């Protein structure tokens, strides 16, 4: 798991997300508390439970982006789900328990990658020997027994040197590699029977897992395939499962987006298949329960839950009281101003202006944005948000696409040219659409 300090986490998030200091601080503290808890001795460690977070803010201000960036920083099992995808137990649709199953699958993948990285040096040595065996098949004596490699020692060392220097990369050889194919059977699970179908799926996948087949490939590609093959052999599947389950139970993070969409409105009456019933199903997960997965039983007591929602129609108080109590840390994200839009266009690590410059550079076209142009684009996006629906920073994508439309279409015929985008260019491309409310409603 990540050992970054809260200050380092906030600094990393600042490279991608403008503003929202409170949300960044809350997430950074929660992530650091995961590490702090793991430093405690066992009796006390078990008693320290995570403080779940509820992020509240209008659409397009950075809630989902914080989740995306957090997933990369966490170095722990992480999953982001949409609350609207789930239905109450007994109805057609996904049940909330599948969140933990998916989180465990994510942990298996993460732990497998870590184990492969740990065993990579040994796997590379073994793969190298297999390549050399294919290049220099060991001699057999008169009884058909394979002799040791010593008789080929000097030749073998010469080939090893060439292999390491890349001189043999394009030579084709025939090697035995794992077939790496499953039976291709996909089983759809009826509600409540996911565990049985998971076991059947595993059974079919295991049927072809031990097979090997001869493949002809270049040494460069064959070496990669054999390294993966050898690394997989060095991993103990049972140990892998246990490590993955431990990682989920101790360090797992679940991000639930659009939680406001499962609030029951006061005036609403009728079946709430995907509303209050889902909240009640979420309760046991958030407060701690045991979920059965195909890898084993997983306890959710110490999994960190971060929920977010725009809460434009509903309010946080419309969540059922029990769920409100399980999300003790409330963070409000503020709406973005024109100045924020200006910073979003230039400051982040891969800002929109940098993306368009890089895309056009592939066609040999050099794009330059003036400071006035950036300010004008930000004002245009802010103005359209004010006049129509406020979709936050997402409006910048629409405005930029409209602005770059002519250049993007003609770029292949403009090789070697430089295009300076200034305030006049922006006004010409966006002026009419921004000023006419009817046009901006349908075009931007």
UniProtKB/Swiss-Prot annotation:
The keyword NADP belongs to this UniProt entry's keyword annotation: no
Gene Ontology cellular-component terms listed: HslUV protease complex
GO biological process: protein unfolding; proteolysis involved in protein catabolic process
Location within or outside the cell: Cytoplasm
Pfam families according to UniProt: AAA (PF00004), AAA_2 (PF07724)
Positions with a binding annotation for ATP: 18, 60-65, 257, 322, 394
Subunit structure as annotated in this protein's UniProt entry: A double ring-shaped homohexamer of HslV is capped on each side by a ring-shaped HslU homohexamer. The assembly of the HslU/HslV complex is dependent on binding of ATP.
Recorded family membership: Belongs to the ClpX chaperone family. HslU subfamily.
Name of the featured protein: ATP-dependent protease ATPase subunit HslU
Species of origin: Haemophilus influenzae (strain PittEE)
